[in-house]
């Protein structure tokens, strides 16, 4: 394992990132739009953390609401949720396979509005 994956004491390195939710998604995350989190740099399989892992991590560790189906469908974000990585559409960045970098800003925007 390279030094960029572990800290000085051999612990798994953490990626400090900002995750934001808008368009109503914030209600699933304690009504808080912006969250600063420290994400493990490797997922449970030992692969570099990517957006797919972040989505699972958010559901398991940050989402307080039981209605996960409003955010995820089949282990991916629901259709109608835009994902921006450092202000760029995630489709330009490789979608779920994008490898998360230190200080990334990931924005989830719901385009679905109930009436």
Swiss-Prot record:
<keyword id="KW-1017">Isopeptide bond</keyword>
<keyword id="KW-0819">tRNA processing</keyword>
<dbReference type="InterPro" id="IPR016155">
    <property type="entry name" value="Mopterin_synth/thiamin_S_b"/>
</dbReference>
<keyword id="KW-0833">Ubl conjugation pathway</keyword>
<feature type="modified residue" description="1-thioglycine">
    <location>
        <position position="115"/>
    </location>
</feature>
<comment type="similarity">
    <text>Belongs to the URM1 family.</text>
</comment>
<dbReference type="InterPro" id="IPR012675">
    <property type="entry name" value="Beta-grasp_dom_sf"/>
</dbReference>
<dbReference type="Pfam" id="PF09138">
    <property type="entry name" value="Urm1"/>
</dbReference>
<dbReference type="GO" id="GO:0002098">
    <property type="term" value="P:tRNA wobble uridine modification"/>
</dbReference>
<dbReference type="InterPro" id="IPR015221">
    <property type="entry name" value="Urm1"/>
</dbReference>
<dbReference type="GO" id="GO:0032447">
    <property type="term" value="P:protein urmylation"/>
</dbReference>
<dbReference type="GO" id="GO:0005829">
    <property type="term" value="C:cytosol"/>
</dbReference>
<comment type="pathway">
    <text>tRNA modification; 5-methoxycarbonylmethyl-2-thiouridine-tRNA biosynthesis.</text>
</comment>
<protein>
    <recommendedName>
        <fullName>Ubiquitin-related modifier 1</fullName>
    </recommendedName>
</protein>
<feature type="cross-link" description="Glycyl lysine isopeptide (Gly-Lys) (interchain with K-? in acceptor proteins)">
    <location>
        <position position="115"/>
    </location>
</feature>
<comment type="function">
    <text>Acts as a sulfur carrier required for 2-thiolation of mcm(5)S(2)U at tRNA wobble positions of cytosolic tRNA(Lys), tRNA(Glu) and tRNA(Gln). Serves as sulfur donor in tRNA 2-thiolation reaction by being thiocarboxylated (-COSH) at its C-terminus by the MOCS3 homolog UBA4. The sulfur is then transferred to tRNA to form 2-thiolation of mcm(5)S(2)U. Prior mcm(5) tRNA modification by the elongator complex is required for 2-thiolation. Also acts as a ubiquitin-like protein (UBL) that is covalently conjugated via an isopeptide bond to lysine residues of target proteins such as AHP1.</text>
</comment>
<keyword id="KW-0963">Cytoplasm</keyword>
<dbReference type="GO" id="GO:0034227">
    <property type="term" value="P:tRNA thio-modification"/>
</dbReference>
């Amino acid at each position: 394992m390279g030094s960029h994956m572990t800290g000085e004491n051999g612990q798994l390195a953490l990626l400090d990132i900002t995750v934001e939710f808008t368009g109503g998604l914030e209600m699933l995350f304690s009504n808080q739009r912006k969250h600063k989190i420290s994400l493990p740099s490797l997922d449970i399989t030992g692969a570099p953390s990517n957006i797919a892992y972040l989505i699972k991590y958010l559901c398991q560790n940050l989402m307080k609401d039981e209605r996960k189906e409003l955010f995820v469908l089949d282990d991916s974000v629901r259709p109608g949720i835009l994902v921006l990585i450092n202000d760029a559409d995630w489709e330009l960045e490789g979608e779920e396979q994008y490898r998360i970098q230190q200080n990334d800003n990931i924005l989830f925007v719901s385009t679905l509005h109930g009436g």
